[in-house]
């Protein structure tokens, strides 16, 4: 490891001592990155409460208040000191601790198993990119479902030159566990990266409890066979489940203590979970069997270093606003109201499809039970052509996935009283195409 910064070398030694698998999963960049213990942010933090603080590039008034513009500050209901200065690269500590507590509360199967304290990133996209920086080499393939968020192409393939290998998401209207197992075991034992996104974008599918057990079993068996597994869990739509028998916990709760050869990384955020899309606050959290506080602290430091070298930090104003909001007395009720509204739209889509069997001649819905979206697969016409007809002739916008001949419909963003018309327009457009 000649040429590495001594701080990176020390972090690597700690990681290798506590988890050889985690060390072997790190990319070259992941091994080289470090949190500058004596860098500008660290030195400014050390001087924070001193009488004279001439460290960081932030302007302050003579009385110590941030030197802000009142025309901007007047729009905010929080103190200027909680909005205008820089946040730490790892995120503000009260928010990180709160999110960790929420992960534990929402995923009780974690029990007392030790996990890392989440590191704040600027949205899930940035979180995934940071994970790519730390763990993905240009020789790596990432195993994921054939129905996937198109931004993975930019995040992992364009940025890190990783290959994408797909398993079939569905077989007989259920999760295709056989295809998943085949793809996991296709290559000889070694480093393998798996990316799982539930509720799935674009399909809106979350595995059942039984399917979740089988997915975990496949991964545990692969780890037992000598594979070093990095399992990335994109939990962007976590919590939006609308059916019984469907997993209500993240797979992270099963995988964080699954095997010493499996490092689980949960990437989630307030974007969808907390209805704060433009705040750009997300989290990266680590879990591995027998993970120690020392291991997790080192991974947090490397992650913070990756954030520092990429975006410096996530906005303080967003972190502070959310932290204040989530601690309010009305937060939980407001969140339940929003989920109930999206659930009504979900059930309306189900009713419309059940009431119109004639639609099946032209399109059928992929399995869906959660999230923001559902997809229809066209049977007789081109998705591109139908998309164009809908847009130009029927003032209806959906997302087209031409390579799969799918249309994605965001019921979460569509008024309930417009959903029946949406599918009627789709039916007519398919007949015209």
Task: Annotate the PLM regions.
Residues 2-3, 93, 101, 105-112, ...:
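PLP-dependent enzyme catalytic core of the Aspartate aminotransferase-like
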Residues 3-10, 28-122, 433:
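N-terminal small-domain helix-loop-helix segment of the aminotransferase-like
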Residues 4-18, 102, 256-340:
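Conserved core segment of the aminotransferase class I/II
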Residues 51-53, 88, 267, 363-369, ...:
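Short beta-strand
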Residues 57-61, 125, 149-150, 199-202, ...:
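Short, solvent-exposed loop/turn segments at secondary-structure junctions
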Residues 79-231, 238-259, 417-419, 424-427:
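Conserved core of the PLP fold type I
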Residues 285, 375-377, 410-412:
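Short hydrophobic/aromatic beta-strand micro-patches
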Residues 316, 335-350, 362-377, 402-405:
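Conserved glycine-rich beta-strand-loop-beta hairpin in the small C-terminal domain of fold type I
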């Amino acid at each position: 490891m000649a040429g590495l910064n001594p701080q990176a070398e020390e972090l690597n030694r700690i990681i290798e001592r506590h988890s050889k698998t985690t060390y072997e999963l790190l990319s070259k960049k992941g091994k080289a990155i470090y949190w500058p213990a004596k860098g500008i942010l660290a030195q400014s933090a050390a001087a924070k409460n001193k009488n004279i603080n001439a460290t960081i590039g932030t302007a302050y008034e003579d009385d110590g208040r941030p030197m802000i513009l009142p025309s901007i500050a007047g729009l905010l209901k929080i103190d200027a000191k909680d909005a205008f200065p820089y946040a730490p690269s790892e995120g503000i500590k009260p928010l990180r601790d709160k999110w960790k507590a929420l992960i534990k509360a929402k995923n009780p199967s974690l029990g007392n198993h030790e996990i890392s304290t989440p590191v704040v990133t600027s949205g899930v996209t940035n979180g995934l990119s940071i994970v790519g920086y730390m763990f993905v080499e240009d020789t790596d393939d990432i195993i994921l479902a054939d129905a996937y968020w198109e931004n993975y192409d930019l995040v992992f393939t364009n940025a890190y030159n990783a290959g994408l290998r797909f398993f079939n998401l569905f077989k007989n209207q259920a999760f295709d566990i056989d295809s998943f197992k085949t793809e996991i075991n296709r290559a000889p034992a070694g480093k393998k990266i798996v990316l799982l996104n539930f509720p799935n974008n674009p399909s809106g599918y979350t595995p059942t409890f039984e399917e979740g057990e089988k997915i975990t079993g496949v991964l545990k068996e692969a780890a037992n066979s000598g594979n070093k597994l990095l399992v990335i869990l994109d939990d962007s739509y976590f919590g939006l489940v609308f059916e019984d028998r469907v997993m209500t916990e993240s797979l992270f709760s099963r995988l964080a203590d699954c095997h010493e050869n499996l490092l689980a990384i949960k990437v989630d955020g307030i974007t969808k979970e907390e209805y704060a899309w433009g705040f750009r606050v997300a989290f990266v959290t680590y879990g591995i069997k027998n993970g120690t506080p020392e291991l997790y602290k080192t991974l947090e430091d490397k992650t913070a270093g990756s954030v520092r070298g990429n975006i410096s930090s996530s906005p303080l104003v967003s972190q502070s606003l959310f932290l204040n909001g989530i601690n309010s007395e009305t937060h939980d009720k407001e969140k339940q109201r929003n989920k109930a509204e999206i659930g009504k739209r979900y059930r309306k889509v189900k009713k419309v499809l059940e009431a119109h069997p004639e639609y099946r001649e032209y399109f059928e819905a992929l399995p869906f039970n959660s999230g923001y979206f559902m997809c229809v697969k066209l049977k007789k016409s081109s998705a591109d052509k139908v998309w164009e007809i809908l847009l130009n002739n029927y003032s209806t916008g959906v997302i087209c996935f031409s390579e799969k001949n799918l249309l994605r419909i965001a019921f979460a963003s569509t008024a309930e009283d417009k959903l029946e018309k949406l599918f009627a327009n789709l039916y007519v457009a398919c007949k015209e195409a």
